[in-house]
Structures are given as C-alpha cells and as structure tokens.
Design a protein with these regions (language model features):
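Key DNA-contact positions within bacterial/archaeal DNA-binding proteins
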Residues: 34, 44, 63
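A short, Lys/Arg-rich alpha-helix, primarily the initiator
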Residues: 1-20, 24
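Short alpha-helical DNA-recognition segment
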Residues: 19-38
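Residues in the recognition helix of alpha-helical DNA-binding motifs
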Residues: 14, 28, 39, 68
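DNA major-groove recognition helix of helix-turn-helix/homeodomain DNA-binding modules
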Residues: 49-64
C-alpha cells in the first residue's frame, strides 16, 4: 500500500469548515466535480496544480495540506 500525498484529516477539516458542498468547493477551485471527495477518501492524489488551487482557496500553505507544517 502506498502512502498518500495529502493529509486527509486536514483536508477534510478544511472542507467541512468551508461550509459549502464539496461540489461547490470544487467548482470554485476549478477542480473536477468529485475531486475533493476522491482526495479525502484516498482514492487518488491531487496534481500539483490542484494542490495549489486548494491551498489558495482555503488560505493555507501547500505544506499544511501535505501534513508538513502549520497553516
């Protein structure tokens, strides 16, 4: 089993705190409709562009989403 790129717990926390549906968040970030669910569930890892889009949208660093540091 391979390690996942993102810290799924942190990503779920950010997504839930946003208050919008996962689909709405994806649309605002320019991601595919179910991308966020796939990243949180561990079905797939985000591309670099998707990781940057999520960090920008949530106002955190990419390192935070990767589980490597503070916001």
């Amino acid at each position: 089993m391979r390690a996942r790129l993102v810290d799924r717990g942190r990503l779920m926390e950010l997504a839930l705190a946003d208050g919008n549906s996962y689909q709405a968040q994806c649309e605002r970030m320019g991601l595919q409709r179910h991308a966020l669910i796939d990243y949180i569930s561990g079905r797939r890892d985000p591309s670099t562009a998707s990781l940057v889009a999520m960090a920008d949208y949530y106002g955190v660093s990419t390192d935070y989403i990767l589980g490597r540091g503070g916001r």
